[in-house]
C-alpha cells in the first residue's frame, strides 16, 4: 500500500516536468520552429505601439529593478556622479499574451522598437547612453501571460547637489530620480519590483574616496502644472574617506606649522634665517590652499578644510609677525627708549645749568652797532695771583626769556688770573654773541688776546666733535635683551599649546 502511494506522489510531481520537457523539446525541434515564428508574427501583427496597454482602462503598473555594476566617479567640482547599471522594467501587456507555447520568449533587441515601452527618463540626468558593444545592450523577454521584461545596460552621469560645509569630513546623499516623462498617474504607475530587494550590487561597490553607508528606495508622486507624475528615487548615503586628506592636506599643514616654530629657537639677530623660514612656510601654506581651491567648486560658504588651513596659515603668519616684534624691540624700540632717556637726562642737565647760569650777572654792551652780553664776576675779588678757574658753560642759544635751547656741553677752561681779570674787567673783553646757530667768542680786538680766543674756539670745536661721536654711538648701543628673549621663550610654549587646543576643538566639532 505504501509503495502504491509513493508511486502516485511521484507521478503527480513528475507530470509537469514531463510536459515542460516535451514542450521544450518541441520548441527546440526544428520542425516546430514554424510554430514559434507563427506565434511571434501573430503577436506583432496589428500591434499598435502608439497605445499603452489597457488604453482607456486602469493605469499600467511598471515595476523596476536595478543591478548596479559600478559607481565610476563622484565629482565635487561638477556636483555629479557617474553610475553604470542594468536597468530593468516589467509590465503586463495583454496584447502580447500567448498560450500555444508555455515558455518565455527572449527576442532580439530590435523587437523593442516594435513594442510599446514606458517613457521612463532620469530626472537628474546630465548625460546618459546605452552601451552598444558588440550590439546594442537591450533585452526583450515575453512571458505567456503577456508580461514584458525590458532590460538596458546604461551609464548615466547624474547631478548630485552636495553640501560641502563639512568637507572632507562630510556625508553626501546622491539620488537617482526615475520618472515618466509624458504619462501621468492616470495612465502609468511605478513601483519597486521586489520591494527592498529591487536594487542589488550596492554592497559590492568600492569607491576610492567614499564608502556607501546606506541606501533607500522611495516611491512618490510629484505634481506639475501638467498633472501628477510617478517617481521612484534611489538614494545613496556616501561617507567620505578621510585617509587621503590626512596624508595629502592635514599632515603637511601640521608639519609646516610646526616647522614655522623652529624660528623661536634661532638667535634673534639671525634675521636672514628667521625671515627666510617664515616666508617659506607662509608661501607653502598658500600653495596648499591654492591647490585645494582648484579641486573644489567656487562655493560661497567656508568648508571645514578651509577652516583648518586658515588656522594653520594664521599660526604660520603669527610666527613671522613674532619675529617682526622681536626685530622691532631689538632694533627699534630699544634705541628709541634709550634716546628718550638721554634726552630726558639732557633736559634735566639743561635745567640745572640754567639755574647755575642765573647766578652769573650779564652786562649788555653795545659796541660798533653790535650788542653783546658780557659775563662778569659779581664779587670782583679776583686776586692778581695765578689761579685756576673752572667754568661749566652750556653750548646754547637763548631766547628773550633766557631759556636754554640746546644740550649741555661741559667746558673746562683754565686760564691765568691776569687774563681772567682782564676779561672780566674790560667790557670789551671776551663776549658772547648770540645768533640762531651757535655761540661765538669775540675778543676786544687786541692782538695779544687773539691766542686765547683761538684756543677757546678750538676747545669748543673739540667738545662739539666729541658730542657728535657720543650721539652716533647712542644709535648703535645694544639695548637690554631681556624682553626679546622672553618673547621667544613664551612663544615656544604659547604657539604649541594654542595649536593643540585648536586641533582638539576642530576634530571634536567636525568628527562628531
Curated annotation (Swiss-Prot):
TM regions (residue ranges): 242-262, 273-292, 311-331, 491-511
Main location: membrane
Modification type Phosphotyrosine: residues: 441
Recorded consequence of changing residue 277 to S: In IECEE2; uncertain significance
Topology within the bilayer: Multi-pass membrane protein
Assembly behavior: Heteropentamer, formed by a combination of alpha (GABRA1-6), beta (GABRB1-3), gamma (GABRG1-3), delta (GABRD), epsilon (GABRE), rho (GABRR1-3), pi (GABRP) and theta (GABRQ) chains, each subunit exhibiting distinct physiological and pharmacological properties. Interacts with UBQLN1. May interact with KIF21B. Identified in a complex of 720 kDa composed of LHFPL4, NLGN2, GABRA1, GABRB2, GABRG2 and GABRB3.
UniProt protein name: Gamma-aminobutyric acid receptor subunit beta-2
Effect of residue 284 to K: In IECEE2; uncertain significance
Noted disease: Epileptic encephalopathy, infantile or early childhood, 2: A form of epileptic encephalopathy, a heterogeneous group of severe childhood onset epilepsies characterized by refractory seizures, neurodevelopmental impairment, and poor prognosis. Development is normal prior to seizure onset, after which cognitive and motor delays become apparent. IECEE2 is an autosomal dominant condition with variable age at seizure onset, ranging from early infancy to 6 years.
Annotated localization: Postsynaptic cell membrane; Cell membrane; Cytoplasmic vesicle membrane
Gene3D superfamilies on file: Neurotransmitter-gated ion-channel ligand-binding domain, Neurotransmitter-gated ion-channel transmembrane domain
Organism: Homo sapiens
Amino acid at each position: 500500500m505504501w509503495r502504491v502511494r509513493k508511486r502516485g506522489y511521484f507521478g503527480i510531481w513528475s507530470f509537469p516536468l514531463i510536459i515542460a520537457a516535451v514542450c521544450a523539446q518541441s520548441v527546440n525541434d526544428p520542425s516546430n520552429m514554424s510554430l514559434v515564428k507563427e506565434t511571434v508574427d501573430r503577436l506583432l501583427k496589428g500591434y499598435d505601439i502608439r497605445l499603452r496597454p489597457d488604453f482607456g482602462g486602469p493605469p499600467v503598473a511598471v515595476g523596476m529593478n536595478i543591478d548596479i555594476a559600478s559607481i565610476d566617479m563622484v565629482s565635487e567640482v561638477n556636483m555629479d556622479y557617474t553610475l553604470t547599471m542594468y536597468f530593468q522594467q516589467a509590465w503586463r501587456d495583454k496584447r502580447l499574451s500567448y498560450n500555444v507555447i508555455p515558455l518565455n520568449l527572449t527576442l532580439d533587441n530590435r523587437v523593442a522598437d516594435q513594442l510599446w515601452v514606458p517613457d521612463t527618463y532620469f530626472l537628474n540626468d546630465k548625460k546618459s547612453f546605452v552601451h552598444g558593444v558588440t550590439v546594442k545592450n537591450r533585452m526583450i523577454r515575453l512571458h505567456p501571460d503577456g508580461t514584458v521584461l525590458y532590460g538596458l545596460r546604461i551609464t548615466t552621469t547624474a547631478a548630485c547637489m552636495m553640501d560641502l560645509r563639512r568637507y572632507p569630513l562630510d556625508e553626501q546623499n546622491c539620488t537617482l530620480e526615475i520618472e515618466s516623462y509624458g504619462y501621468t498617474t492616470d495612465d502609468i504607475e511605478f513601483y519597486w519590483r521586489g520591494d527592498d530587494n529591487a536594487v542589488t550590487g550596492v554592497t559590492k561597490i568600492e569607491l576610492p574616496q567614499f564608502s556607501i553607508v546606506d541606501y533607500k528606495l522611495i516611491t512618490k508622486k510629484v505634481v506639475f502644472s501638467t498633472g501628477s507624475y510617478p517617481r521612484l528615487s534611489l538614494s545613496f548615503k556616501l561617507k567620505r574617506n578621510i585617509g587621503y586628506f590626512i596624508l595629502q592636506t592635514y599632515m603637511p599643514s601640521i608639519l609646516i606649522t610646526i616647522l614655522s616654530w623652529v624660528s623661536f629657537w634661532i638667535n634673534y639677530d639671525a634675521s636672514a634665517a628667521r625671515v627666510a623660514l617664515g616666508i617659506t612656510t607662509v608661501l607653502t601654506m598658500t600653495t596648499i590652499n591654492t591647490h585645494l581651491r582648484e579641486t573644489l567648486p567656487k562655493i560661497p560658504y567656508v568648508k571645514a578644510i578651509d577652516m583648518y588651513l586658515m588656522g594653520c596659515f594664521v599660526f604660520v603668519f603669527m610666527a613671522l609677525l613674532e619675529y617682526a616684534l622681536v626685530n622691532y624691540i631689538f632694533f627699534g624700540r630699544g634705541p628709541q627708549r634709550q634716546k628718550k632717556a638721554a634726552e630726558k637726562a639732557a633736559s634735566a642737565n639743561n635745567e640745572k645749568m640754567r639755574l647755575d647760569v642765573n647766578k652769573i650777572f650779564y652786562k649788555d654792551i653795545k659796541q660798533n652797532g653790535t650788542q653783546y652780553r658780557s659775563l662778569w664776576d659779581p664779587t670782583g675779588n679776583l686776586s692778581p695771583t695765578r689761579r685756576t678757574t673752572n667754568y661749566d658753560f652750556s653750548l646754547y642759544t637763548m631766547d628773550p626769556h633766557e631759556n636754554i635751547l640746546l644740550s649741555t656741553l661741559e667746558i673746562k677752561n683754565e686760564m691765568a688770573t691776569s687774563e681772567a681779570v682782564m676779561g672780566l674787567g674790560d667790557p670789551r673783553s671776551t663776549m658772547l654773541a648770540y645768533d640762531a646757530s651757535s655761540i661765538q667768542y669775540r675778543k676786544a680786538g687786541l692782538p695779544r688776546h687773539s691766542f686765547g680766543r683761538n684756543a677757546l674756539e678750538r676747545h669748543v670745536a673739540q667738545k662739539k666733535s666729541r658730542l657728535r661721536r657720543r650721539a652716533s654711538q647712542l644709535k648703535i648701543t645694544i639695548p637690554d635683551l631681556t624682553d626679546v628673549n622672553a618673547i621667544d621663550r613664551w612663544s615656544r610654549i604659547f604657539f604649541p599649546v594654542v595649536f593643540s587646543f585648536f586641533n582638539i576643538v576642530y576634530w571634536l566639532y567636525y568628527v562628531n
